[in-house]
Amino acid sequence: MAIGTPLLKGSIKFLLLGSGELGKEVVIEAQRLGIECIAVDRYQNAPAMQVAHKSYVIDMKDYDALMAIIEREEPDYIVPEIEAINTDALIDAEKMGYTVIPTAEATKITMNRELIRRLAAEKLGLKTAKYEFADSLEELRDAVEKLGLPCVVKPIMSSSGKGQSVVRSEEDIEKAWKIAKEGARGIGNRVIVEEFINFDYEITLLTARTAEGTKFCEPIGHVQIDGDYHESWQPHNMSAELKEQAQDIAKKVTDALGGYGIFGVELFVKGDEVIFSEVSPRPHDTGMVTMITQEMSEFEIHVRAILGLPVSTKLIHPGASHVIKAEINKYAPKYHIEDALKVPNTKLRLFGKPNAKVGRRMGVALAYADSVEKARELAEKCAHAVRIE
């Protein structure tokens, strides 16, 4: 393929929908290959906007606003980075001849827990948690009774653990309904109710669909707090048999979704069984660890796969990531990083978010070592040494 020059006739254009920390790294990798990048989000000065050639601030759930930018910019690739996007606009753009990554249909299916669960469990026959759906508090009570306690309640559409809760007693049901409604994205009150799986561990299996075929990164282990990523490490130690099971599930799901790019396939492991949880058709937050562990990060893999270029998923050494969270609410925060940078074998990535909020991810510490355990220690030490004021 021939790559033109950014901002000149013949350039290759990425229209990035969503401009958070993951999108920022995608833009940086695309820029390195001479791709013209346009970043879109609902607020000004979002992380990816700071490194893109051009940016727009719109509500991406607004069909007309989104279509207006697509028609104005005429991108070669529309690259969703978040889930709060009007998928009807993506489907129509695809019909008009635009390339949506990985596909418009894949974007629609994966942002809706009902659609992806029905695809995985009912169409593909994959092992998942038992589940029910509910549209009212009464239906939720019935679903909980069917599945038994404890169980997990999630909005059909939400992100980063928003709206999720565990129901451990009948007294929790009404509270879970309220939490789901408050955390939901989009219209309607529909929720998915899942059996609580007391898993041994959970992993993300980064799966790249490329012109050369499907490739897998080494499994990534992670810790979630309130459904949100807190730390991750690679490789996560698992048997060859379980890894093969995980890859088989990931390939079936990503083949069904189609298109090119990287997918973050989330899986539970319990005993000798791998259970499908969810999938994101884009780089995954737990995959930030690949910036220090692999020959190519998940972001470089994503960009190369989109463009049909060669991809490597080779692991260089064990490593870990640990999030840096704000402990204050402040606009235009400042960072003290001197002590963090004294920690050996580590790197920092500050996201550049204009607003610090208590509990918000503002950066990530990355570390490598001879073992995952040592890397986790170093990453945590580095992250906790950053002071935000």
Curated annotation (Swiss-Prot):
Q: Does the keyword ATP-binding apply?
A: yes
Give all cystine bridges in this chain: none
Give the record's pathway.
Purine metabolism; IMP biosynthesis via de novo pathway; N(2)-formyl-N(1)-(5-phospho-D-ribosyl)glycinamide from N(1)-(5-phospho-D-ribosyl)glycinamide (formate route): step 1/1
Enumerate the GO terms in the molecular function aspect.
ATP binding; magnesium ion binding; phosphoribosylglycinamide formyltransferase 2 activity; phosphoribosylglycinamide formyltransferase activity
Residue positions annotated to bind N(1)-(5-phospho-beta-D-ribosyl)glycinamide are E21, L22, E81, D285, K353, R360, R361
Top-level taxon:
Archaea
- Where, in this chain's numbering, is ATP bound? R113, K154, S159, S160, G161, K162, G163, Q164, E194, E195, F196, I197, E202
Q: Which family does it belong to?
A: Belongs to the PurK/PurT family.
Q: Which PANTHER family does the record match to this protein? A: FORMATE-DEPENDENT PHOSPHORIBOSYLGLYCINAMIDE FORMYLTRANSFERASE
- This protein is called Formate-dependent phosphoribosylglycinamide formyltransferase
- What is the native source organism of this protein? Methanocaldococcus jannaschii (strain ATCC 43067 / DSM 2661 / JAL-1 / JCM 10045 / NBRC 100440)
